[in-house]
């Protein structure tokens, strides 16, 4: 397998003959021996005349380019629960990985679902009325739900980034994010993607509890943890599990203050 880079002017496409010719040269074989060719990155070069830079993976006919294996999600209705605090990106993908491992995610989110959250955000923008638990920071999808969904990371050492991109495509994002140098989902699509992730989690037996702010976490009698939440109607509910994943985001200061009061370990990102 080799990588080749081709350029073309904006508005023009690379022909199959051009691509296969470049692939044959890179692989050191004849045209008939060229196998698969896959676009892996597209970027704009605006230095001088604006052009596209297109990077392809190519291989011989005797080889195969490695494909993406679609994760299998298990039915977890009767599986061991794991509490996930927060329904932002970290919480959603933690829940998906729990499904892959046969564990039941119980997602507790202080804000509202993405549809109901829109009205609280609009009320804040139009009238200055703040719902402290449902706003730009809190609610399904996390703080970036109502952005244009730019996707970037400063680290390539903490997991398979392409797996995340494929997951977004699976749940409704454009396939262009797999190849664009600066991918973004789009403000019109992002809430749909977030909702589709929730539907998948629930269909496989996971749980979502919105409008549920965590007020206490304490060791349970059987070695696990009891998590107490306060609902929007003022009612308290306790959830129990052996394990908790804290995906509370940067704005949940009350959670960090709770940990500090209990003298539990806290460290900077």
Segments predicted by a language model, with ranges:
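Residues forming the flavin
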Residues: 2-52, 56-146, 150-269
């Amino acid at each position: 397998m080799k990588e080749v880079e081709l350029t073309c002017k904006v508005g023009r496409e690379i022909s199959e003959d051009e691509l296969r010719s470049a692939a044959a040269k890179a692989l050191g074989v004849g045209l008939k021996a060229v196998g698969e060719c896959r676009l892996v990155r597209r970027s704009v070069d605006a230095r001088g005349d604006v052009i596209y830079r297109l990077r392809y993976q190519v291989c011989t006919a005797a080889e195969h380019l490695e494909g993406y294996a679609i994760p299998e999600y298990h039915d977890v209705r009767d599986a061991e629960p794991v509490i996930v605090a927060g329904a932002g990106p970290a919480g959603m993908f933690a829940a998906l990985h729990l499904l892959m491992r046969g564990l039941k995610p119980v997602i507790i989110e202080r804000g509202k679902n993405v549809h109901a959250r829109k009205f609280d955000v609009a009320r804040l923008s139009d009238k200055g009325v703040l719902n402290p638990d449902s706003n730009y920071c809190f609610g399904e999808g996390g703080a970036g739900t109502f952005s244009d969904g730019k996707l970037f990371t400063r680290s390539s050492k903490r997991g398979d980034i392409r797996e995340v991109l494929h997951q977004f495509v699976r749940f409704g994002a454009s396939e262009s994010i797999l190849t664009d140098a600066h991918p973004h989902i789009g403000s019109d699509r992002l809430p749909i993607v977030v909702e589709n992730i929730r539907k998948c989690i629930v269909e496989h037996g996971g749980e979502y509890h919105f409008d549920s702010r965590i007020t206490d976490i304490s060791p349970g009698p059987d070695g696990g943890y009891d998590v107490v939440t306060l609902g929007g109607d003022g009612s308290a509910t306790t959830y129990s599990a052996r394990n908790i994943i804290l995906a509370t985001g940067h704005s949940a200061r009350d959670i960090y203050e709770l940990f500090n009061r209990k003298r539990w370990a806290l460290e900077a990102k």
